[in-house]
Amino acid sequence: MGIIVSIIALLLSSSAAYAQTPLVERIRFTEYGIYTVDRDVQGRDVLGINRAAATNVRHAATLRTIPAQIGTTFGFRYEVVGRAHAAPVELRQVVIFPSPGLTPSSSSKPVRQDEFVLQARIGETSYASYTLEDAFELVPGEWVFEIWQGNRKLATQTFRVERMSNACDPCEGF
């Protein structure tokens, strides 16, 4: 009888552990465009691109065409859809730069993409972005943002960065 009770207890505990394992089904985008943020720059990564923590994130404009101006932050908010609610998940943001890539002053070769770790929770809204901070980042063309979990691509967002003329009234303040 003791063996049967032990087996039942083992089965119940393993099914409870399975039920709590996070399962990411997909990404649902909630908004995109240009944002205003307070940034705490934490230094440059090995590619020469600034790493920063963003706080006080505010959506400023829903745009796919982004002005190539220093200080412009663009990206998206998203929700991780899956189980179990509020479970933490580690994702990866890949930013693919337009050809020929970015050439930081610390590099002689163009950088074609960069990666960032995203900490998110299932069912909660998260934020991913890129801020144009240096002149070498003002590369016009298609910028592709991807969100990955392990080797599985969950989502893609595309923005077009363009040099704007001085007559770009809608771009003032960005």
Predicted region positions:
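Bacterial N-terminal signal peptides
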Residues: 2-14
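Residue-level signal for functionally critical sites in structured catalytic/ligand-binding pockets
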Residues: 2-3, 61-62, 140
